[in-house]
Regions:
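Juxtamembrane/disordered regions of integral membrane proteins
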Residues: 1-252
Length: 252
């Protein structure tokens, strides 16, 4: 049985996002951290970082943590956001991966480029570290597009295997988006941090984008297009302002 297009794309977003996230967000982050430690020089080697590790040491636990959070979780969220916003990104053609990655940097860059993270003080120069971590976002977007397209095509075969993979992808999407929304709205009852607010914004955008896509032909009308682009621009401005503020504080 052929899987509906939107369902396939949601599943493909989860699966391709995790794969690319593990490589770029997980292993890529580990590489950036290693380069940061080398660039900082011998004077900081052995100093304890904000996550409890020591500068210059590569631990199995730390690497697994990066792969799970920076790879599996962040990758799945990024892949689902791409699936949700795919119609809006299509107009950029072959540049859509780069545009998505840069947009993701604006929206969620503050999750990584956090001025409260003391590592940006310990590891110098800060400009190099900010640039390397920021570069991971467009790399993720560029790498995601071809993997996503191939995954969507593979899930369209109608076989038992493709159906099983689609089921896994949908289950991951429901789990992550559900937990993300519940956690985010629960945080609103107290004093949410900027990280919690941006995370909630990402999940709301995923849900809203998929809901808008489910409306089908209504999305093609001029009023709907203008409204949705306006909402996307507003969300991007909010996230980008927060990211830019964090970068300025790190560099100064």
């Amino acid at each position: 049985m052929r899987i509906p297009e939107l369902v396939r794309e949601v599943a493909a977003g989860s699966l391709s996002g995790i794969v690319v996230g593990i490589v770029v967000g997980g292993l890529g982050s580990r590489l950036v951290m290693r380069l940061s430690a080398i660039a900082a020089g011998s004077s900081v080697q052995g100093i304890t970082t904000s996550n409890g590790n020591r500068v210059g040491e590569i631990t199995i636990g730390g690497t697994i943590g990066l792969i799970l959070f920076g790879g599996v979780f962040a990758g799945a969220v990024g892949g689902l956001l791409y699936a949700a916003l795919r119609p809006w990104l299509a107009r950029f053609g072959r540049w859509r991966g780069l545009i998505f990655g840069l947009g993701l940097l604006g929206l969620a860059g503050s999750q990584v480029l956090d001025e409260a993270n003391s590592d940006f003080i310990i590891l110098r120069p800060p400009l190099l570290n900010v640039a390397m971590f920021a570069l991971l976002f467009p790399i993720f977007g560029i790498a995601l597009v071809p993997v996503f397209d191939r995954t969507v095509h593979a899930l369209d075969k109608g076989s038992l295997i493709s159906g099983a993979f689609a089921s896994v992808g949908i289950a991951v999407a429901i789990l992550f988006v559900g937990l993300g929304l519940v956690t985010g709205f629960t945080a609103l009852t107290s004093a949410p941090s900027s990280v919690e607010l941006i995370t909630l914004l990402l999940f709301v955008m995923i849900l809203a984008g998929l809901a808008a896509r489910a409306l089908g032909s209504r999305l093609a009308s001029a009023p709907w297009r203008l409204a949705t682009y306006g909402i996307l621009a507003a969300a991007l401005l909010v996230g980008a302002a927060n990211t830019l503020s964090g970068v300025v504080r790190i560099l100064t």
